[in-house]
Amino acid sequence: MLARNNSLVTEFILAGLTDHPEFRQPLFFLFLVIYIVTMVGNLGLITLFGLNSHLHTPMYYFLFNLSFIDLCYSSVFTPKMLMNFVSKKNIISNVGCMTRLFFFLFFVISECYMLTSMAYDRYVAICNPLLYKVTMSHQVCSMLTFAAYIMGLAGATAHTGCMLRLTFCSANIINHYLCDILPLLQLSCTSTYVNEVVVLIVVGTNITVPSCTILISYVFIVTSILHIKSTQGRSKAFSTCSSHVIALSLFFGSAAFMYIKYSSGSMEQGKVSSVFYTNVVPMLNPLIYSLRNKDVKVALRKALIKIQRRNIF
């Protein structure tokens, strides 16, 4: 039962992506296709990396984790989003909302630092190729990955913990298709000052540290590439980084655009722009890394040949 005036909210209503009933069915099929492509693409990459020993390198180790994060990240809210397109009342419990918020933030922040680790990996590969195997040892890769998940856990715990201290009275309609920080803060009937400070600190840290690390890494990378005399060597070095640069641009660019829309006070535009950040980016990542990567394409071709041979015999 939904909360009444002067009572504490135990359930929320997700406003969803659109108020127009005629758009719900087309949007359901659109996001179902996006979700299926995301699942197949990321599961496919995870399987390829697991079965092909020549892909057991630092670069593909980070890419394996990136695919795992995208897989989980997309599964946090997309099934509920699809259900909301076909159900009359988009109700979610307080506990369910906070749980989804926690895992959403955990995977988003972890992906941020995983992309940062990949930038450092590219820096070592291009700027210090002779020391690459020593510098990017299995132990170092494991530590960087562990650090990415720890940062995700810390950020998600801080945000969700502060959200749990808020009281929600009569307003219970979340103007979004998922439980996110800013739409929830608007519903609180108690002071959100602490939450706003935490948002400032956590978001500031999770933007500044990765951005500076990535920027410094690519300054050194570009400088090293420009010092390569042969055109072929320079082209090979650029192609090594191109997929990662595209992934970085999509992730950080769409996130920045989404929060610019939110900060301008336009919740409707904010939640529409967040579709690209939350749904499209996890779908595009496996396509970017598979279509532009020779090793992945070779591994995929071999896997398809094996499947064809099994079907024949």
Swiss-Prot record:
Cell compartments where the protein resides = Cell membrane
Bridged cysteine pairs (disulfide) = C97-C189
Topology in the lipid bilayer:
Multi-pass membrane protein
Cellular component aspect of the GO annotation: plasma membrane
Which terms does the record give in the GO molecular function aspect?
A: G protein-coupled receptor activity; odorant binding; olfactory receptor activity
Please provide the record's keywords in A-Z order: Cell membrane, Disulfide bond, G-protein coupled receptor, Glycoprotein, Membrane, Olfaction, Receptor, Sensory transduction, Transducer, Transmembrane, Transmembrane helix
Question: Which residues face the membrane's Cytoplasmic side?
Answer: 47-54, 121-139, 218-237, 292-313
TM segment ranges: 26-46, 55-75, 100-120, 140-160, 198-217, 238-258, 271-291
> Which sites does the entry annotate for glycosylation?
N5
The record, for CDD domains, names:
7tmA_OR8B-like
Q: Topology: which residues are Extracellular?
A: 1-25, 76-99, 161-197, 259-270
Biological-process GO terms, alphabetical = G protein-coupled receptor signaling pathway; sensory perception of smell
Q: What does this protein do?
A: Odorant receptor.
Q: Which family does it belong to?
A: Belongs to the G-protein coupled receptor 1 family.
PANTHER family in UniProt: OLFACTORY RECEPTOR
Task: Output this protein's name.
Answer: Olfactory receptor 8B2
Annotated organism of origin: Homo sapiens
Q: What is the lineage of its organism?
A: Eukaryota, Metazoa, Chordata, Craniata, Vertebrata
